[in-house]
Amino acid sequence: MRDVVRFINPYDPGLFPEDFPDKEVVNLSSNENPYEPSEEVREAYLRAVKYIPRYPKADYARLKKALAEYTGFEVENIAVGCGASELISCICNVLLEELDRVVIPMPSYTLYSIYAMLRSASISFPVFEGYRVDPDVIAEERPKLVFLCSPNNPTGNSLSREIVQKVAESAEYVVLDEAYVEFSDDSKIEMVRDYNNLIVLRSFSKFFGLAGMRVGYAVCSAEIAEAIEKVRLPFGISYPAVETAIAALRSLDYYKKVRDRIVRERERLIEKLKEIEWLEVYPSDANFVLVKANKEGVVEKLAEKGFIVRDASVMGLEGLYIRITVGKREDNDRLIEALREI
């Protein structure tokens, strides 16, 4: 076994309903879309079931064509993977040599570091309060690769175009994770046209509500996209996943209405949380809300009351932080009552 593997902490996904077999719980931990898929997606899935014994076409040409229409980029600028997580792994595999400098501003998504460590990279974790990233601090590291997240997980805030631009001008490569961007309408994806070293990651798990299907994509230079395609799993995205993803892209009107409902509910939830005096509530551009709790054992006490929320202290935050997925209105109201009872 490689020595580096012994030092890697496994990714911690938090608690799941399966961890509570004797209790009915509401999962507000994983930033999932609480609404059912569109009718077109459900029908596409049912049609695809009969193809489960078959491999999907390995180039995923139909999916890439649909993504090209959605993003406005050429097919040659798109790489696909079994969730954005596979693409993070592929990016590290094609870009990083041993001891290359990687910068991961914190607090942020912990999976970036796992795949960078597997490449034996030299990783720096500068901490920026509230994820207010300082490009000058990053530039001092002279990085080969920088991972940025906007809106950031877990803080929920977006990075400005100016910050992304400055980082792209100082780093050899920049990954901009936009898994939650459809909830903010503040995408920097057009910057790929001006910066060949910028890789924008997207996911079908959040806005499109296909977390169980595992589909992600990257928009980047044709050279980087081709390299990613060389090393990704050849059949990593299942046939049903391909068909449901394409159907989701055809159902944009439905998903925009769902998005608008989630955003309205997010703002209402934020105001309700602010009424609880022992919570410090942060603004959000995503489908979750970060709060700092001034009481011990909040995650455990909420679990006892039937709610799973994410302990965000494992994501580079110091103190008692919890991340709450924006659920349906009735679930959010029950959560507020549970918090008031603590």
Swiss-Prot record:
Keywords: Amino-acid biosynthesis, Aminotransferase, Histidine biosynthesis, Pyridoxal phosphate, Transferase. Its cofactor is pyridoxal 5'-phosphate. GO terms for biological process: L-histidine biosynthetic process. Pathway: Amino-acid biosynthesis; L-histidine biosynthesis; L-histidine from 5-phospho-alpha-D-ribose 1-diphosphate: step 7/9. It comes from the Archaea. It catalyses: L-histidinol phosphate + 2-oxoglutarate = 3-(imidazol-4-yl)-2-oxopropyl phosphate + L-glutamate. One of its GO terms (molecular function) is histidinol-phosphate transaminase activity. The modification N6-(pyridoxal phosphate)lysine is found at K206. It is an enzyme of class 2 (transferase). Its EC number is 2.6.1.9. Pfam families: Aminotran_1_2. CDD domains: AAT_like (cd00609). NCBIfam families: hisC. Belongs to the class-II pyridoxal-phosphate-dependent aminotransferase family. Histidinol-phosphate aminotransferase subfamily. This is Histidinol-phosphate aminotransferase 2. The gene is hisC2.
